[in-house]
Amino acid sequence: MKLVESRNSGEKEFLQAVLEVSEVIIPFIQDNKKYQTHNILERLVEPERTIIFRVPWQDDSGNIQVNRGYRVEFNSAIGPYKGGLRFHPSVNLSILKFLGFEQVFKNSLTSLPLGGGKGGSDFDPKGKSESEVMRFCQSFITELYRHIGANTDVPAGDIGVGAREIGFMFGQYKRITNEFSGVLTGKGINWGGSLIRPEATGYGNIYFAQSMLNLAGETFDGKTIVISGSGNVAQYSCEKAIELGAKVVSFSDSSGCIYDPDGINEEKLEYIKELKNIKRGRIKEYAKKFSCKFSEGNPWQLKCDIALPCATQNELNLNDAKALVSNGCIAVSEGANMPCTSDAINHFQSSNVLYAQVKASNAGGVATSGLEMSQNSLRMNWTREEVDKRLKDIMLNIHSSCVEFGRAGKSVDYVKGANIAGFVKVADAMIDQGIVLSLIHI
């Protein structure tokens, strides 16, 4: 770790992700000499390529603005780089390296031929007109296009990048290259997208949690759930949980948290979708419309059976974990990327709370992106039912892999299981493909 820290000084998010993985992987490597011989861990924590570029664009007043763009192409041992683009003021190299590193393991768990990467910009779409967002997206992809391709690197959406932004970037890519290909996923259904893609991460989160609960002799039926966030992952985690008989009582955004003790039903969820996806409003407007409680902060002090953190990294700390456990929470399934701090994770595990780590529980989105890539290659569209079944099968297989590598007596360490299962496939591929040992000059 000292070498990693010296090479990545000040990159706290990335170092946190590497440390959490290393704590699980190092003992496994010590028991498997081939990974030591090939120095796999040191190779794995170094991105294959990091691209940083400026993104100039013109605002509606005619002024030239400049943002910074990134693409971290982390590992391509098992397939083309795959991972989202995030547009948010908090974006920096550390965050994207952490996300790209996590993506390597997550993509490996899906069993699809997908490498890992991540990208984005410190551009903030909030408060920008549609024309400004379009001009930024076009400028961003005008540089990025030379580094991506259907068999090289296939970006998707993330925070701040939805179907609108993917459309603007895909259109510009097509103009530049004169090519219609599956270079981006999250596309509109009429121009190469896949059904279930918007729902996939949320649905996948619930499918994984359902498998975890079933193994422990529990179900979603009748359970009270608290959810943080109010974007796609939160919305569709809620939708699938309601379908399985659970009662969801909270949503949140950066302004605060709503608590609806009567439960968020299908009608209320449709209101949230319109509020957040179309009107781009604040969640406190829900509290006004449905006369329920709104407060600043997060929902982790609320009494619940299951917690689904679906907002952002490190949103749930040790004190939050203690509150959840004392309030009777039996399971936590991560929808966001690294939403729980290390202390919180340790507390859940020591308290025998079922804890699903993001590498496994959040893999539904990239799995369905992989299915979109397959449909693009085949020049065909699968039905909603076909995609949903394939997604569910993938999540059940991920759960089985986590159980295989994480079983400890009668219990399952899902952190250990997810990390080792994801590691083995990538590490073995890296060994099989060799390294350049010498250069021959003619």
Go through the PLM ranges and name each one.
Residues 307, 440-442:
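Conserved small/polar residues in nucleotide/adenosyl-binding loops
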Residues 188, 193-303:
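Glycine-rich phosphate/diphosphate-binding loop of Rossmann-like nucleotide-binding domains
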Residues 256-355, 360:
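Rossmann-like adenosine-cofactor binding region
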Residues 35-63:
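Structured beta-strand/loop patches that form or line metal/cofactor-binding pockets in enzymes
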Residues 98, 152-156, 180-184, 227, ...:
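General beta-strand structural signal in soluble alpha/beta enzymes
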Residues 1-19, 212, 325-438:
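Adenosine-phosphate binding glycine-rich loop
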Residues 88, 107-220:
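Glycine/serine-rich phosphate-binding loop and adjoining beta1-alpha1 elements at the start
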